[in-house]
Amino acid sequence: MTVNPMAPRILIMAGGTGGHVFPALAVAKNLAEKGWQVRWLGTADRMEARLVPQHGFDIDFIDIQGVRGNGLLRTLAAPFKIMRSIMQAREVIAEFKPQVILGMGGFASGPGGVAGRLAGIPLVLHEQNAIPGMTNKLLARIATKVLCAFPNTFALAGQSVQVVGNPVREELALLGSMKQQGQHDALKVLVVGGSLGAKVLNEVMPNVVAQLSRSLSITVWHQVGKNNLASTKACYQQMGQAVNVNVAEFIDDMEAAYRWADVVVCRSGALTVSELAAVGLPSILVPYPHAVDDHQTVNAAILVDAGAGFLLPQAILTSDNLAEKLSLFANNPEVLVQMGKQAREVAVLDATNKVAEICAELARKS
């Protein structure tokens, strides 16, 4: 592909989890379609190393790892590793010469953001979670523009923070306007525990299905995560119920999964919460209890407080109380419809365009 040397250039920093990478990819595609040169900064051992090239973008790697809670020796070595990674990022920036840098979380964002500001390049930060990560908390003090998905995420004296929502794929935003909910022959339950799955959901759901199938018609599509396929299938088979269950290690086509589902049982990562709002689906949210600063519980509150989801903390999750919640949906299809509408009410559907335009505006001024 021929590269226009006069095209505006952006360096995007996002990695580690899908909650960082997929929103950043949405912005990258938006800008690329407008003729921008997009380059990525990440780490070689995290998911961005695989996903970003698959979507057609060049990626550079720096050597950086998380330092929070990693022991005394790694903590003592951290300053030296951070300085080295900042120098590596400066080399990438000097070679690519971006007009603007977008940080959306992950290990590479810290060194890349510092290197960019040292080079005098505008830095845009986007925080996907309701509670900011440590890297974004620090970078927010030097960023040119701070964006967040949810209100009251940052408290920065003398600096404006703009709430723009979380970028989601265009096809998901469109799906929400077309999706119809109501009475079906069977309640369609989508179970998603993230790319690695959720052990507790893998263990509880087969028992839930066994309970519900005695009196209700239910069908399940269950993403169990890497290396959990055989064990979870065995759990369902041990229940001895003739239930329609599709068990998958990973669901590549989430649009199809959301289109199929009536209700979602899931963790409450920022991207998941934003996608549920965009597609207008009710949910039963089981926050990951070991997330930094318990940010998944705060994320979940966005939907729960809007009447779009139920919160079931992992500490009290049982097959009985999960089955009770799903029975409510199965026996009251009007609840599905109403909660789906409430989810759609909190959706921010133009977040991708907003983030892209803010980056473009700063690039024009630089």
From Swiss-Prot:
PANTHER family: GLYCOSYLTRANSFERASE (PTHR21015:SF22), UDP-N-ACETYLGLUCOSAMINE--N-ACETYLMURAMYL-(PENTAPEPTIDE) PYROPHOSPHORYL-UNDECAPRENOL N-ACETYLGLUCOSAMINE TRANSFERASE 1 (PTHR21015). It is a peripheral membrane protein. InterPro entries: GlcNAc_MurG, Glyco_trans_28_C, GlycoTrans_28_N. Cell wall formation. Catalyzes the transfer of a GlcNAc subunit on undecaprenyl-pyrophosphoryl-MurNAc-pentapeptide (lipid intermediate I) to form undecaprenyl-pyrophosphoryl-MurNAc-(pentapeptide)GlcNAc (lipid intermediate II). HAMAP family: MurG (MF_00033). Pathway: Cell wall biogenesis; peptidoglycan biosynthesis. This is UDP-N-acetylglucosamine--N-acetylmuramyl-(pentapeptide) pyrophosphoryl-undecaprenol N-acetylglucosamine transferase. Keywords: Cell cycle, Cell division, Cell inner membrane, Cell membrane, Cell shape, Cell wall biogenesis/degradation, Glycosyltransferase, Membrane, Peptidoglycan synthesis, Transferase. The gene is murG. SUPFAM superfamilies: UDP-Glycosyltransferase/glycogen phosphorylase. It catalyses: di-trans,octa-cis-undecaprenyl diphospho-N-acetyl-alpha-D-muramoyl-L-alanyl-D-glutamyl-meso-2,6-diaminopimeloyl-D-alanyl-D-alanine + UDP-N-acetyl-alpha-D-glucosamine = di-trans,octa-cis-undecaprenyl diphospho-[N-acetyl-alpha-D-glucosaminyl-(1->4)]-N-acetyl-alpha-D-muramoyl-L-alanyl-D-glutamyl-meso-2,6-diaminopimeloyl-D-alanyl-D-alanine + UDP + H(+). The keyword Cell membrane applies. One of its GO terms (cellular component) is plasma membrane.
